[in-house]
């Protein structure tokens, strides 16, 4: 009550912000005539002037009015588009690091140019993030003439681009790309072994288009770079035969082997189900007699069984995935797009492959990962645009510290949003949908039908075919035709059936998108220039008449075939109609068989329906029901927010560790001299080893000197008789032992360094350190995954799972860091270097490395290169081909036991002959 009174007196926070922005708009508008009077050359010179003013200490905020005025005028000259006042407000919202909520058709792509131009002047790079490669390329192509006119360069990052091209794209002033590509490049940059292989610059400023889709819908999906792990493919096939033998129970307390919690998206085995599954697995020979699935040795079996059950009960073809070219391709539940290249983790993808009888690919092991939540929080400044952010404003504020500002439309919205119509069954609902479409088609009103799955879009398409109604289907299977279909969805009588329209990125223009049609004519090579011009002229003449006819028919009519879990997705579908003051309408058709109504058991609504509409095919519509349904959606949104927040809380633990590892890795990559760091590592490792077997403040009787000597010999090739030291000097203690051992190791290491040269040794050290860190980090990520999967069980012991996870993760990270230091010290101190008897030191200083030996069986694995590879690199820096074929072509005859012609000193069969 008091809040409402205060809002009436002082206005809302949004109103106050808009008031401030309008003052700046007035200053920008005051400069318009001045900018229009400038020649092209003078207008272009403004960019250099702004850069100089920034270099002289002026701030971006200080030059904002002039920069926005310049960008607006340049846009008018190059693109033929002038920014409206509300678009100027949107640009300022983005510059301030906030989210601009702008309705569909309000020109978000043009709005971004203002903030992008201003921030690009700082020379630190600006990233414009879109949801797919098509939109990234399209938006960059549309806006490049504007940016180039203003003296700025534009790059585009798309999948399958080579590293060199990526470096060039990131070096541009403005870089367009998808959230996936930006995130994966960040991870790949933190896996390189040479700093010059990195592609990204510092993460400065990002403008995220469809920000709700990227930062909320995809927040639960981490970006993962992975490699194939050892996996038993046959086990997935065998486990696939088990679910059909188990009985599904209707409720948690019912009779059967398992029940499905659709709300939580989980499958739970009952006690009887465990026993039944154990019997089946015992008969198959996978489980020993009287053994349990709960025993530690059978965790893998349990893992595969639950994956198979989830694949059979929770994941459905043409809803959650499609089969394309013999592969399982995931369908994005929010947009209906195919997510090629994405795979479910924890063996689920393999279980679905087994269910569908396609080739099963090995499960992957995580090499590097990050969530979008943590990736985008790395930017110095982050902003976003969307048509629907207000419903998620709290989440944007609490997780990303992003305030949402609702930008008023340039023209009032005239769309009519009718109440939902609710039917008993899905069959009755779809009959009503077809009837509504038929009526619209008769009066020439275009219709967009939104469905939540590919299965439903194909069902609607089938019903329309039976009714003889021509239509287009737009779902994940028709991805390539997507933009063309959407562009023409506003033509007279057009019927378009589409899975969720979120993120489609193309405006529906009443009367059809004239530009798309004229572009298609211009691209038709079969037509002469005269024919093209004639067709374009005829098209332009007829377009206005068609546009007027659609306006008279009521504009675009939106039909939703069911409510989505998120109100935001429903609003995005509705928002396709009524763009820029156009007329339009929307209505949702629901049934009590729809997942949302079924799962949230709207008993009261069902009772009302039975009382008010007893006849078949009769629907009810009432504000009370609509509010109840929105209440159910709020429950789901709240639950999903809690899940995303929980993912973030757990990932924040790994994120802090990731920052430490990546920071250390970067320091190693960029430091010219790492000798001090190496010395510190050797000292720490020796000290820890001595403390382990000679604990500080302990009695001499508690010391384990023989084991210490054995460890030093095995791990560091250090053969020291410590026991004789102790006999010779009774006063000696652990600290003295440490100092002597460190001195011996340092002397030996200095001798090796002198033998091969300081730079060669530094390069070798750097390579070893990076390989060790990467391998140890990879194993640590796997261990963290296992910890995360089972940590919820701690709650049964009255412990807080999150606190337990943090505590154990911290201990594991300490062990990881100690393990990294130990492996680095062990590998580098145990390496033996022999002087090359052939090569002349003065001529080939790097040639001193002849061969590298190590007692450690992990040497080759940890280095990632064999001894031969390292020697070959050293003696063949220009990549000369010494294969038998190449030597024969050059007229050289080299036998297997002859010295390798590369100069390594090794026999040919042990060097390039081995590689061949």
UniProtKB/Swiss-Prot annotation:
Keywords assigned:
ATP-binding, Cell inner membrane, Cell membrane, Cytoplasm, Membrane, Metal-binding, Nucleotide-binding, Protein transport, Translocase, Translocation, Transport, Zinc
Specify which residues bind Zn(2+) according to the UniProt entry for this protein.
900, 902, 911-912
- What are its GO biological-process terms? intracellular protein transmembrane transport; protein import; protein targeting; protein transport by the Sec complex
Q: Name one GO molecular function term.
A: protein-exporting ATPase activity
Give me the disulphide-bonded residues: none
Annotated ATP binding sites: 87, 105-109, 507
Q: Could you tell me what this protein does?
A: Part of the Sec protein translocase complex. Interacts with the SecYEG preprotein conducting channel. Has a central role in coupling the hydrolysis of ATP to the transfer of proteins into and across the cell membrane, serving both as a receptor for the preprotein-SecB complex and as an ATP-driven molecular motor driving the stepwise translocation of polypeptide chains across the membrane.
Q: Which CDD domains match?
A: DEXDc_SecA, SF2_C_secA
Cofactors needed by this protein, per the record, are: Zn(2+)
Family to which the UniProt record says this protein belongs: Belongs to the SecA family.
The reactions it catalyses are: ATP + H2O + cellular proteinSide 1 = ADP + phosphate + cellular proteinSide 2
Q: List the Pfam families.
A: P-loop_SecA, SEC-C, SecA_DEAD, SecA_PP_bind, SecA_SW
Subunit comment for this entry?
Answer: Monomer and homodimer. Part of the essential Sec protein translocation apparatus which comprises SecA, SecYEG and auxiliary proteins SecDF-YajC and YidC.
Annotated Gene Ontology cellular component terms: cell envelope Sec protein transport complex; cytosol; plasma membrane
The name of this protein is Protein translocase subunit SecA
Q: Does the keyword NAD apply?
A: no
The record's cofactor note says: May bind 1 zinc ion per subunit.
Where does the record place it?
Cell inner membrane; Cytoplasm
EC number assigned by the record: 7.4.2.8
What membrane topology does the annotation report for this chain?
Answer: Peripheral membrane protein
